[in-house]
């Protein structure tokens, strides 16, 4: 850990820091999209990419031979296509985690990926996505000796990390490490000072409780937390517990959080399995927010109205995202922001 980014002054900026681009990957894994099929998955990803491209460039990784479908569905928009062999399409988890320093130089962290604790047999190609992205952006490369996914943590860019015990302390990730050792890795590789641990994620989450489904930073000293008013819902107690933890926590600068809440949509099932639907799983672009709608008019409307309130100065774009969530994740899961840096990327 002597070569960790923090000692060189690098840290992960908050998602509201200006972006150079957004990274995505084109759907390709048949098992992931077995509920709806690859064609519908590609159309769903195209909706997200085009919505984000209103605000910033999108770079899309596409398996060789599948470029035509990406070009046809994303034609005429601010979207660049790069051919790269991939196993799956969740760049939040498999892509680089970007860092900057006070000189606005760019670095990238390459975590170890084990397909969310071994959910899928082959993730060999995805283990190279981060290094390819880092090389493409000419960022400084850091390899982290830790199994980690980008959706398992949030940062405020001011020293605070938000994560969950269900995921990071799961025996299918880093069983040889203690909580204290994992904390030290996070602090050193994300350039932070304090970690806030939530306990449990959503019931049925294939990622073992990624935090980007349950809570996120929305501004310095402010967090947004998922809740449900339905006491019979199996998520009720775990979401309420997370809410209480956030209310009683302070960030790295000693601020008590201002906690906003958004209600989860009604339980929704596909092929007998409950989908992990959450309005928390959105993408914050340059002056824009791309957030999900799930087809529940009153819930979607209330979530939209809340976002208008808590994100002043941002254009809120709400898109049908049920098909994205059918694959086990959401809008935040399929995107990865690259912060603006001192040296522009050479094309």
From Swiss-Prot:
<feature type="active site" description="Amidino-cysteine intermediate">
    <location>
        <position position="333"/>
    </location>
</feature>
<keyword id="KW-0378">Hydrolase</keyword>
<dbReference type="GO" id="GO:0009446">
    <property type="term" value="P:putrescine biosynthetic process"/>
</dbReference>
<comment type="similarity">
    <text>Belongs to the agmatine deiminase family.</text>
</comment>
<dbReference type="InterPro" id="IPR017754">
    <property type="entry name" value="Agmatine_deiminase"/>
</dbReference>
<dbReference type="GO" id="GO:0047632">
    <property type="term" value="F:agmatine deiminase activity"/>
</dbReference>
<dbReference type="Pfam" id="PF04371">
    <property type="entry name" value="PAD_porph"/>
</dbReference>
<protein>
    <recommendedName>
        <fullName>Putative agmatine deiminase</fullName>
        <ecNumber>3.5.3.12</ecNumber>
    </recommendedName>
</protein>
<dbReference type="InterPro" id="IPR007466">
    <property type="entry name" value="Peptidyl-Arg-deiminase_porph"/>
</dbReference>
<dbReference type="GO" id="GO:0004668">
    <property type="term" value="F:protein-arginine deiminase activity"/>
</dbReference>
């Amino acid at each position: 850990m002597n070569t960790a980014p923090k000692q060189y002054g690098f840290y992960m900026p908050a998602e509201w820091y200006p972006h150079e681009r957004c990274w995505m990957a084109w759907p390709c894994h048949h098992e992931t999209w077995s509920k709806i099929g690859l064609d519908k998955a590609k159309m769903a990803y195209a909706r997200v990419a085009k919505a984000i491209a209103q605000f910033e460039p999108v770079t899309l990784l596409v398996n060789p031979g599948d470029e035509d479908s990406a070009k046809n569905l994303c034609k005429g928009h601010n979207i660049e296509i790069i051919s790269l062999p991939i196993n799956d399409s969740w760049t939040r988890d498999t892509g680089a985690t970007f860092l900057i320093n006070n000189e606005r130089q760019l670095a990238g962290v390459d975590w170890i990926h084990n397909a969310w604790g071994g959910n899928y047999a082959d993730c060999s190609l995805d283990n190279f996505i981060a290094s390819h992205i880092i090389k493409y952006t000419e960022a400084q490369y850091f390899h982290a000796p830790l199994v980690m996914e980008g959706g398992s943590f949030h940062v405020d860019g001011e020293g605070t990390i938000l994560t969950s015990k269900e995921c990071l302390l799961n025996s299918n990730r880093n069983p040889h490490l203690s909580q204290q050792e994992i904390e030290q890795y996070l602090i050193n590789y994300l350039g932070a000072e304090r970690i806030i641990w939530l306990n449990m994620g959503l019931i049925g989450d294939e990622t073992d409780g990624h935090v980007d489904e349950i809570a996120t930073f929305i501004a310095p000293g402010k967090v947004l937390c998922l809740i449900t008013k339905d006491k019979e819902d199996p998520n009720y107690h775990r979401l309420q517990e997370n809410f209480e933890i956030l209310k009683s926590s302070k960030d790295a600068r000693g601020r008590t959080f201002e906690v906003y809440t958004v209600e989860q949509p009604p339980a929704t099932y596909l092929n007998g399995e409950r989908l992990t639907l959450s309005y928390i799983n959105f993408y914050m672009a340059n002056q824009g927010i791309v957030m999900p709608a799930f087809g529940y008019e009153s819930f979607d409307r209330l979530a939209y109205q809340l976002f208008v309130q808590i994100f002043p100065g941002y254009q809120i774009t709400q898109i049908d995202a049920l098909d994205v969530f059918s694959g086990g994740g959401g809008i935040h899961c399929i995107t990865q922001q690259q912060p603006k840096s001192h040296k522009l990327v050479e094309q």
